[in-house]
Amino acid sequence: MTEYKKVIAQNKKALFNYFIEERLEAGIVLKGSEVRSLRQGKASIEESHAADTRHEVFLYNCHIAEYEKANRFNHATRRPRKLLLHTKEIKKIIGRIRIKGYTLVALSMYFNKKNKVKVELGIAKGKKLHDKRESIKEKDWKRDQSRLIRQK
């Protein structure tokens, strides 16, 4: 059974720059003008990451554009946003992040079937330069294989 997801933003760089070891879903605390802006698709999570602060997890560097029809009570575009997770999940994430080399990266932001905004997070380990080159070669080889198969 496939789940309904209306994708707002994706972080394609994260898949290239990190080895994603585990994926999880989290809710996010937003203001009304932020939700309206997200419905228009005006968000970017290219440079965003999550970190723990006093047993809570926050999403940093996520850009949600200002809603142009909002009045003077508009939101700040790059403010830290609290992620909604269960206590067990938070403890598990904090335990994994504290290990050297691991980070929590936002992979995608979407509306679920109940029209709630969700963020897909990945517990990731950074790639070295030679790993990135290897993944580029692998990608090119798969592309060449599909071309060869189509030509036959």
UniProtKB/Swiss-Prot annotation:
Q: Name one GO molecular function term.
A: RNA binding
Give the location in the cell. Answer: Cytoplasm
Coiled coil spans: none
Biological process terms from the Gene Ontology for this record are: trans-translation
Q: Does the keyword Repressor apply?
A: no
**Out of the domains of life, which is the source?**
Bacteria
Q: Which UniProt keywords are given for this protein, alphabetically ordered?
A: Cytoplasm, RNA-binding
> GO cellular component annotations, sorted alphabetically?
cytosol
Chief location: cytoplasm
Task: Briefly state the protein's biological role.
Answer: Required for rescue of stalled ribosomes mediated by trans-translation. Binds to transfer-messenger RNA (tmRNA), required for stable association of tmRNA with ribosomes. tmRNA and SmpB together mimic tRNA shape, replacing the anticodon stem-loop with SmpB. tmRNA is encoded by the ssrA gene; the 2 termini fold to resemble tRNA(Ala) and it encodes a 'tag peptide', a short internal open reading frame. During trans-translation Ala-aminoacylated tmRNA acts like a tRNA, entering the A-site of stalled ribosomes, displacing the stalled mRNA.
**Cited NCBIfam families:** PRK05422.1 (NF003843), smpB (TIGR00086)
UniProt family annotation: Belongs to the SmpB family.
Q: What is this protein called?
A: SsrA-binding protein
- Name of the gene: smpB
